[in-house]
Amino acid sequence: MIAIAAIAACTTTSRPIPVRPSGPPVLSSGKPHDVNMRADLNATLDSIMKVGIAEGAAPGGVLAVGRYGRIVHMKGYGRQDTAAASAPVDENTMYDMASLTKVIATTSAAMILEEQGQLDLDRTVASYLPEFNAPDKAAITMRMIVTHRGGLEAFAALYKEFRGRDQYLAQINLRPLKSTPGTETVYSDWDLILTQLVIERITGRTLDQFVTEKVFGPLGMTSTMFTPDSVQYFSRIAPTEVDTATGGLMRGLVHGKVHDENAWAIGGVAGHAGLFSTTHDLSIFAQMLLNGGEYNGVRIVKPATLARWTAPQSGASSRALGWDTPSKNSSAGNYFSARSFGHTGFTGTSIWI
């Protein structure tokens, strides 16, 4: 499990409000009282994490909290897996991000292309992917799929029969719709796989190549990548699960390979899952977003672009473009402001900003 929160909401008015940095902040360490947060914050977070581990929610995890460019809490807890000899977790432990891939990688790439004028959210998916030509899908636009309103089903176990991008595109094209495009919000992995394929068609690069060049590399996120199954990273990666025959693949201990079976069947680089990262790297990414698309002199997107992509798109849904925003019973809890945005992942990952 990994949880990261970049806090922007006020927690109390009993102490003077700290002076914010004059320019876009670069992360530094601080104490809760430095940024007007409760003095017992760290002790409270320690207790929550330790209780969760003791109750078996996870063998370990990492939690980071920051405000005004100060990381006031970044700490690893427990171990990488349940084995007694397993390595302890720290801020550099790499986790399978699961559906955080949708926002950290795929949405970031799409946002860059839209800002550059290479991606038009109101064009149909078929105009970018002519193979996506089923009559019932002709009206599906890019805006619909990045807000999960394309009418596609949430998921299917295609990994039991199919492999690779081309086969997945063909099968998604053939799958029946769950609703009329544009009428309902259904969280769908297919939406972000299609977004990935559009990005790759526009750029002529694979998603991992493009997002590493345009986002992870410039930001210095050196531990954020797809397919990290090499000797260099293996000892830092927390195993995800033991895959049994029930999943149809029998991969054994899933360690250094993507947990999501459809992402694995596509090749490990997928728009909906497959990214690995650390709390340290995600703190940089989160601060870039809080800075309006810039970090340490590196501009990823313009503030107006970021504001547009992180705002709810419909009164009928909390969904922004790629991102989610707070709603009743959402994972944001009760204290993030209405302007916040975030996402979660199946493997226990979470980011709220």
Locate the predicted segments by residue.
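Short, surface-exposed beta-strand/loop micro-motifs that present aromatic residues
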Residues: 340, 347-353
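Acidic/histidine-rich, surface-exposed loop or edge segments in extracytoplasmic proteins
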Residues: 23-33
